[in-house]
Amino acid sequence: MRYVVNPQLVLYVEKGQKIKRALYLTPYGTLDDKSPIYYFLSTHLKITDPEVHKRHILLTLKISQLKGYLCDLLRIRNDVIIYSHKNNLEYSYVDNTIFNPFAHTQKKTLIKSDGFLYNIYPDACDFLVIWVADAEDTSIAEFGSYEDVDVNILKFETRLLEVFDDLDLDMTIESKFNNIFRTNLKFTGLRKLIKKINEFNGSRYKSLLYKSDEYFINLTGNKFILTDERLNLTVWDSDGVVTFSSDGDTIMINNVKLFTSLLTDIDLQMERIKGDVTYKIFLSTPITSRIKLNIETSFIFVETATNNILLSADKRISIILAKNHISIKVKNYIPNIEKYFTFLVIAINSMFNNIQQASDFTKVETVYWSRICQNTKNKHRKPVIVSSLDEDMEKVSDNFYKSSTKEVFINSSGIMFSCLDPLNKYNYVGFLSIFYRLQKMCIPCCFLKNQSHTETFSSCVYQKEIASDVINPYILNFGKVVTKSKISFLPIIFDSFFNEGVKIIFEQDNKRLKETIGYHVIKSCDEDIKRLRTISDIIAFVNEDKNILIAEDIIYFPMNYVDIGTRVYILIQEIVHEIVVVKKHMSKDAIEVFPPNYKLVKNLFPRQTKFITIRSDSGMELTTDGFLVDGKEFNVDLSSNYVAFTKNITTPYTLSKYFSPLFKYAITESKNRFMKTWLINTMLRLGIDLDLDTNILPKLEKYYPNHGKSV
């Protein structure tokens, strides 16, 4: 999702609140006639041609700083009053009604504020409209004032607008609300809530009211699972995210809008225990996590002793920076504030911390090449700077010349590089592909062999773009995230397992693939990037995708053997990759990709049952693989406005021992709950009552033989 910085509106009015100037501010520099601001301007104020300024009011300013900025923007030096039709800004009444200097009621006591704009004006990120009036034109001229602008704010705004067009504002956001209250809901209140959920939002939300005691488990809703609590109401949205959860005494609320909509006729007492929001924002383009600010920015951030942690100016928002994501913790919910602060971080990173450009590599006294291009005793890989071209050199392109003994590359600054190895080995000029792929920087390096056949050489010398779908023959070591054009080795243990007896030939002195008739490697998935951060994420992904996934040294299978597909995934730094077979002929550059030999790992599945029908009646079958209706699996979500109940059980030693060989293969966040669920389902399927039936093992051996081992 690409974040769009919304336009802002400044209205300068005269007597009678007549608008004499309408300033439309936007960092894009053009008017967006589809924006809510323009709709308000054209429809409600009947202004269709406002002044368009490439400017931006920082939402982190205090009201006094904002007033100084507005005075400078409007080029006025007299006392003014600033206000808004949506929120109180500079002044407010005791009863918090909206202040308007042209409709002032003396009976109400005015309170002056110098708070931060985004706190005082909660919709500021989406819809900021500020009215400015000359104090002498109002009935309360004594309340007006003038502020000088902070020049540092103008300097920052100028720098921000300079880099704005180049900012990558694509981001993916995950949020976690920590709104926890004490309540008086109890069981009766929870029953009312789930009844409303089932009546009005049953198709959109999943819900479960769960109550248990020593003997029975009672369930109501449309998502039937076991929990570890005696009493619990949980509601999930369509993405499987918990919207709110309560045990009757406390409640955790993630979706405030949904929860409040259910309270129309419920007398609820709530006492806040904790309230904040944590956002995790994943960036499309990496940033420098350790920000160093070159100008005064205290009106935006407060720097801390840890240089990857920032605080907002009011110290109520904390920001933790990492290379590929930002974590933002907000004390109170403010619409889209996390996107706005992410925008500011990306902008500041671009202003002050951008990776140095190629010109920095041309100064002899500060030359730095990566570790793979340094001189050693027997290798001279770092190119030298030469002052001129030899007479016998031929022009290959505008920036590359060669003779029978030497090659010269000329960078964008006119600096000439050549490879003059005293041992006469590393004489060919090439380029470091990692710098070009990441930053489009052509950093020369010296090689043993001619590099003119490489993609990076073609890009730097002939300005040809690298085809992103062509696989690079260099095989990365396992552990790095694999991009579209790369492949990497499997972890050692799985490399040995998948590639036992398979021959692979590499180029001399490196890991460039030369030839193989079929070798298992890792490549990126062709689909969108998929992140799995928790065990729950992994389990859900495997069961939904119905394919095998490897994470660290564990192989995750779908629950049913018959569901296992033909793809094999592997997790690297929380990102899903896939295992494939590559083939390459020595005489060809192309690398062919084929599906993996999935049967190698599928045969490791610990529980392979025979399909056995337990009961059958009127086209319905209860089997060891599930419940079938007319031969098809019954997978319709069940829903109940009534209470369904089953016997509660403890885990008898006999059953636990019988299934223990199977349970050791189950990967779950709550092993005891999984075992309990398994046993309840098994007893229900087989029609066994633990209190009455003492001859259990023979029945288990019939349908689940050999103590849960493979059959």
UniProtKB/Swiss-Prot annotation:
Q: Where in the cell is it found?
A: Virion
- Please list which residues make up the signal peptide: none
Record-linked Pfam families: Pox_VERT_large
The UniProt entry, under InterPro entries, shows: Poxvirus_early-TF_lsu
Which keywords accompany this UniProt record? Activator, DNA-binding, Transcription, Transcription regulation, Virion
BP GO terms, sorted:
positive regulation of DNA-templated transcription
Q: One GO molecular function term?
A: DNA binding
Transcription regulation among keywords:
yes
Q: Name one GO cellular component term.
A: virion component
Its subunit composition reads:
Heterodimer of a 70 kDa and a 82 kDa subunit. Part of the early transcription complex composed of ETF, RAP94, and the DNA-directed RNA polymerase.
The entry's family comment says: Belongs to the poxviridae VETF large subunit family.
Its function?
A: Acts with RNA polymerase to initiate transcription from early gene promoters. Is recruited by the RPO-associated protein of 94 kDa (RAP94) to form the early transcription complex, which also contains the core RNA polymerase. ETF heterodimer binds to early gene promoters.
Protein name listed in UniProt: Early transcription factor 82 kDa subunit
